[in-house]
Every structure is written in C-alpha cells, then in structure tokens.
C-alpha cells in the first residue's frame, strides 16, 4: 500500500455559512423588546464575535501552513471547532431557565480555551500525514459527543423542570396542612385561655370571700382574748376569765339563795291565798243564805196578808 499523495498547495477547503440576514419587517411604533429578547441578542452578538476571532486565528494558522511545503490545509478542522465553540457558547437559557449574564460570559471564556488546544492536536495529526478519513472520523465523533452531551443536559434539565411542580405542589400541600393544624391549635388555645380566665375570675372572687371571713374570725378571736397565731389564751385573758368566773360563781350562789327565799315566800302566800279562798267561800254562802232568808220572809209576809184578807172577806 502506497501512502496517499498530498493534495496541491493551491487547493483550499471553504465552507459557506447560511445567510443569517433576514428580510426586515417593519415593526409598529408601540413595539417594545422584552428583557429576555435583549439578553438573547447580546449573547448572540458575543458568540458571533468569538466565532469571528477564531476564524481569523485559524486563517492565520492556515496561511503559515500554506507557506510550509507538503502540509495540508486545516480549514475544515477550524470550521468544525468554530461550530463547537458556537454551540458551546449558545445561551443556556434556550435549554433551561435563563442564567445571569456573568455566568454566561464565564462559560464562553472557558469554552474558548480547550477548543484551541483541540485545534492544535488535530493540526498535529494533519501535519503528521494522516489520511483525510481520520479527520472526518474525529470531527464526526466530536460532533456526536457534543450532541449526546447536549441531549443529556437537555433531558436532565427537562426532568428537573418536570419534577419542580410536583415538589412545589407537595410543599404547598404540606404548608396548607400545617396552616390548618396551626389554626386548629390556635382555636383550642383560645378556648383554653377563655376557660382559664373564667376560672381565674371565680377563684379571685372565692379568695376575696375567704379573706373577708378570715378577717371576721380574727376580730372575734381578738375580742375573746384568744391568740389566733398560737391558738391559746393570753395571760391577761386568762386573768380576766378567772375573775369573771369568780364573779359568775358568786352571782350564782346569791341567785340560788334568793330563789330559795322566793320559794318559801311563795309557799306561804299560797297557803294564805287558800285560807282567803275558804273565807271568801264562807262569806258567799252567808250572803246567799241571807238572801234566801229574806226571800222566805217576804213570802211569809205576803201569805199572812193574803190570809187576813180572806178572813175579812169570809166574815162579811
């Protein structure tokens, strides 16, 4: 097998990009760009500038390669690397939620560095005299790897997006349940507070009544000469109680003697009353007898007068 001949130096691979210019359509005067449109336009401008710089660098490298004899051009490899850089510089907001501009610029600056190293490796392989089929295989593998990575990242982000609403719904449901539980607990606490307040009012009233009763009891004990703290009588109260007891005993003795005398006098008076009663009865009997006697005498006189009158009538 003979080694493949190198192509002539004047042959150059050129790729034509699709025209990005679009027909200008007139916009209404009230048209206003949204914030995400302005961010996308800025990112697209940044990617085109980066791609242009890479193309210029690749053209310079290819110019130096053309000057060296027996070296193939590297236009195709640089174009594939530019495509990769443009794909890597696309805004991640197109695949998932938009990120801030600082992170996007950092991603673009980081993605530019390894691309140049890849270009150098591929150019080394080309300078070493490898066949063109190897170059196409490498470019295809890189494209497939980039597409697979992009699809993996897109699917992961889509899965994350799909799971977010479920987690939000769960969190909202949990929050609602917690709020309902808290409301029920608050109601129970309010009820307990009202009940305890009512019990406190009742207890305060009972305490006030007990304090009044205690004050009355203390006043009574002090009036009787009792010590409420010790629960015993004091010396002065004891002396007073002894004197009072002696006085009461003397009074009792005198009362007993007086009662005895009263009983004796009462007995005598009863006897006298009975004698008076007998005398009164005798007097009453005498009065009755005298009255009857007078009545009898009057009747006798009447009868004698009547007899005299009858005798006179008979004599006539």
From Swiss-Prot:
Compartmental location: Nucleus; Chromosome, Centromere, Kinetochore; Cytoplasm, Cytoskeleton, Spindle pole; Cytoplasm, Cytoskeleton, Microtubule organizing center
Keyword Nucleus: yes
Coiled coil: 166-216, 248-316
Tissues and organs where the protein is expressed, per its UniProt entry: Widely expressed, including in skin.
Domain notes: The coiled coil regions mediate binding to kinetochores.
PANTHER family: SMALL KINETOCHORE-ASSOCIATED PROTEIN (PTHR31940:SF2)
Subunit structure: Part of an astrin (SPAG5)-kinastrin (SKAP) complex containing KNSTRN, SPAG5, PLK1, DYNLL1 and SGO2. Interacts with SPAG5. Directly binds to microtubules, although at relatively low affinity. Interacts with CENPE; this interaction greatly favors microtubule-binding. Interacts with DSN1/MIS13; leading to localization to kinetochores. Interacts with MAPRE1/EB1; leading to localization to the microtubule plus ends. Interacts with PRPF19. Interacts with DYNLL1. Interacts with MAP4.
Name the record gives this protein: Small kinetochore-associated protein
Annotated source species: Homo sapiens (Human)
């Amino acid at each position: 097998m003979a080694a493949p001949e190198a192509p002539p130096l004047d042959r150059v691979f050129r790729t034509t990009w699709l025209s990005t210019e679009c027909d200008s359509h007139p916009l209404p005067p009230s048209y206003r760009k949204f914030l995400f449109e302005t961010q996308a336009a800025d990112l697209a401008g940044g990617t085109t500038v980066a791609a242009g710089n890479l193309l210029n660098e690749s053209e310079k490298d290819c110019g130096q390669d053309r000057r060296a004899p027996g070296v193939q051009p590297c236009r195709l490899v640089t174009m594939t690397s530019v495509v990769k850089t443009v794909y890597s510089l696309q805004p991640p907001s197109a695949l998932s939620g938009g990120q801030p501009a600082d992170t996007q610029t950092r991603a673009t600056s980081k993605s530019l560095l390894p691309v140049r190293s890849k270009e150098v490796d591929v150019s080394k392989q080309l300078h070493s005299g490898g066949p063109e089929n190897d170059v196409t295989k490498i470019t295809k593998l890189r494209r497939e790897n980039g597409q697979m990575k992009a699809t993996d990242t897109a699917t992961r982000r889509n899965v994350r997006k799909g799971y977010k609403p479920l987690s939000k719904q769960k969190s909202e449901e949990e929050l609602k349940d917690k709020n309902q539980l808290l409301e029920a607990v608050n109601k129970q606490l309010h009820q307990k507070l009202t009940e305890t307040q009512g019990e406190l009012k009742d207890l305060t009233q009972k305490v006030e009544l007990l304090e009044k009763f205690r004050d009355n009891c203390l006043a009574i004990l002090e009036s009787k000469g009792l010590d409420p703290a010790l629960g015993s009588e004091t010396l002065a109260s004891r002396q007073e109680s002894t004197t009072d007891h002696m006085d009461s005993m003397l009074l009792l003795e005198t009362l007993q003697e007086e009662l005895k005398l009263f009983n004796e006098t009462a007995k005598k008076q009863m006897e006298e009353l009975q004698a008076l009663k007998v005398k009164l009865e005798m007097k009453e009997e005498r009065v009755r007898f005298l009255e009857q006697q007078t009545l009898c005498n009057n009747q006798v006189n009447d009868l004698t007068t009547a007899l005299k009158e009858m005798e006179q009538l008979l004599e006539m």
